[in-house]
């Protein structure tokens, strides 16, 4: 959806827990597309996320999309699937074994306007989960605002 939005981490981890692989863009094997509310991209099944900070619904949901906000009405259940280390976690070529080999980070790190892709997911999500650290993501802010957030959150910006 957007590398700087928390809902991206939710969908990536949800896919991995179900034994699915994640791709940055739709491809021939796409079963489900998860997109932001401004996206025109569609998959065989498309879930649209408003990207509202509190996860509110999409104000004008297209007829060919499901609204991510609908999951809030569902019970909290965890249905993790056993996953082989050799199965692909991120397309192309990143296995679940590769995911757990990402160096963990126990630091409090701030990322400003991260680019989409595996590098963002491994740094913003995987490294702090494996290392007990935390991530602050800032999007669309000025350098001054980013520096103020870094000071407030007691982090150092990561280039």
Where are these regions (language model features)?
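C-terminal structured interaction module
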Residues: 119-139
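ANL superfamily adenylate-forming
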Residues: 33-105, 150, 154-159
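Compositionally biased, low-complexity linear motifs
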Residues: 105, 110-111, 137-156
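A generic local structural motif
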Residues: 23, 97-101, 122-123
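Short beta-strand->loop structural element characteristic of the AMP-binding/adenylate-forming
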Residues: 1, 8-12, 16-41, 46-55, ...
